[in-house]
């Protein structure tokens, strides 16, 4: 062995040692990353399983409530001296012509009431006659409103060649979006009617419809989601004077906004037939030139362009 090769041996040994140490460090780093990745995968898998279990549990539970219609004004909300004045003081939504006609009962306790504007329904005619519902808490705090949109209803009815298509806009206090509930024009004689709507949830629309039951004795409707699953039901009592409906929604769909839409829709069932006849008659009168159409300012506001210059 030459002197030159003997001098290279320490250098080569040091290089080999450095390479081995670098390899060990790289291997340890890879193992650590692999361990972290496995931990993350396990956490994600555990989270997905928990979400799936929660959804499965929710599908087994049902949220239910009752809507009971009163036949007189002799109730604790309206009966008594100065009751109406005090009610108007509790909420600006409680107008002078507000008539409370039903209560919401959950777990045996009244949690809310339904009212409608009597002056513009019973005491009006033509294009001035329309339905406006209000949902209040038991202490008369406003929760939601449901307005018949005559302009849209007549437009759709004329487009459906006389089949009455009633349209309602629903404003809930917890949401930034309006909900539009509309009767389907695809309605054949003796077949059940459908009312469709959608809710925005996390930027994603969720579509639903209320379909009247084929065997319908008390005003029964089934709530169906966009996958054609039955996720709720409105069951009307047969032997009742005013009207009583037991409503239920499957737990995984029991969103507060959906519950409010169902409460308002159930209250509307009482007026549904007269509302259809009213819209159909208006469409015929406008078509034949018997009346000049006009839209009330409150309804016109609902059609305003949100991007207009204010």
Regions found by a protein language model. Give the residues of each.
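Low-complexity or membrane-interfacial segments used for flexible interactions
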Residues: 2-310
């Amino acid at each position: 062995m030459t002197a030159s090769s003997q001098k290279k041996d320490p250098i080569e040994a040091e290089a080999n040692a450095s390479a081995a140490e670098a390899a060990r460090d790289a291997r340890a780093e890879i193992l650590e990353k692999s361990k972290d990745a496995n931990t993350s995968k396990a956490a994600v898998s555990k989270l997905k399983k928990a979400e799936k279990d929660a959804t499965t549990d929710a599908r087994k539970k049902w949220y239910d409530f009752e809507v009971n219609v009163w036949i007189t004004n002799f109730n604790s909300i309206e009966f008594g001296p100065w009751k109406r004045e005090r009610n108007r003081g509790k909420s600006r939504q409680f107008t002078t012509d507000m008539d409370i006609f039903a209560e919401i009962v959950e777990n045996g306790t009244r949690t809310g009431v339904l009212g409608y504007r009597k002056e513009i329904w019973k005491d009006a005619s033509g294009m001035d006659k329309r339905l406006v519902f209000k949902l209040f808490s038991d202490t008369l705090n406003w929760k939601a409103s449901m307005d018949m949109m005559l302009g849209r209803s007549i437009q759709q009815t004329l487009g459906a060649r006389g089949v009455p298509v009633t349209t309602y806009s629903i404003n809930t206090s917890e949401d930034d979006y309006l909900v539009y509930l509309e009767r389907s024009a695809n309605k054949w004689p003796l077949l059940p009617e459908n009312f469709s709507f959608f809710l925005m949830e996390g930027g994603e629309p969720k579509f639903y419809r209320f379909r009247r039951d084929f065997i319908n004795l008390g005003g029964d409707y089934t709530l169906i989601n966009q996958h054609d699953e039955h996720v709720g039901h409105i069951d009307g009592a047969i032997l009742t004077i005013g009207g009583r409906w037991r409503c239920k929604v499957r737990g995984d769909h029991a969103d507060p906004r959906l519950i409010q839409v169902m409460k308002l829709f159930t209250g509307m069932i009482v007026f549904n037939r007269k509302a259809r006849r009213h819209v159909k008659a208006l469409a015929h009168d406008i078509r034949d030139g018997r009346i000049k159409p006009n839209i009330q300012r409150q309804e016109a506001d609902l059609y305003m362009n949100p991007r207009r210059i204010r």
